[in-house]
Amino acid sequence: DTVCFDSGRVETACNAFVCGPDLLQPQTFYRWAVTVWDNHGENTTAESSFETSLSSKEWKADWMRTPRAYVQRKKGFGTQPPATLFRRAFTLSAAPRRARLYATCLGVYRLTVNGKRPDMREFAPEHTSYKGLLCFQTYDLTALLHIGENVLGMEVGDGWYCCPQTQPPIDGLQPDHTVLFQLEIENADGTHTRICSDEGVLTHESAVRASDIFDGELYDARLALPGWDMPGFTAADWLPAVKDTRQSDSVLYPQFDDPVICVKELPAQLSLIHISEPTRLQL
């Protein structure tokens, strides 16, 4: 391995941010080791590793939004427009040696790759100022991709970005469901493949008929599309996503905090199969 930085022994009273390399290369795996001495001459050593993300100059993907006409959001349960399914199919001629996906959206999204979730995070990309900062997430997809057809799926709901209770109009930008993603694949033969959000992205309304970060979600199981995020699915009635030139890559920043995950699932206390007349439920 090439040593990119060696501080040598630094005599200082500081115990954090002592020194470091001026610039690290993007999309690069690094190992580090540090040895610390105390005032008695005793020392201890620790080693670990990290990987740098995509830099702002390396974004080649297009912002792609739903073709649906803009709908003004209103407060209240069930008043929001449906969530949007974004589907991007692509074909690989070889199994990847390394694959990283960088993704974000305007809204909140749930990612699937060939029908499987790469991790269990929820509410990505979470709440930021949007105008000045929008976080993107990094996923290791190496084990989820295969030779032949592959499918990236993103289901996007309103989240904080479109919520009338948390986000006033942002400089006149309409809060359409919009995605941005870039998949960087290193092939076994040393070649490189890039898959981006572009005109190849297809869209469809989700079975989630309305979603609000405070008021909850309205789901119609009759409208579910089994297999929509898997190879072999026929997307004949899907509409192509529309390129959104209003968005800027300059606000993108790698996520800097831990993801939101589910730590406990509460079982349902009441299940209704059929109600023949109007009924009031007190839960």
What residues fall within each predicted segment?
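Short, solvent-exposed loop/edge segments of extracellular or virion-exposed proteins
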Residues: 63-74
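Single conserved hydrophobic/aromatic residue that forms the stacking wall/gate
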Residues: 273-283
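Accessory beta-strand-rich segments of carbohydrate-active enzymes
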Residues: 29-33, 38, 51-56, 76, ...
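Catalytic cores of secreted or luminal carbohydrate-active enzymes
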Residues: 226-261
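Short, surface-exposed loop motifs enriched in S/T, G, D/E and P with embedded aromatic residues
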Residues: 265-272
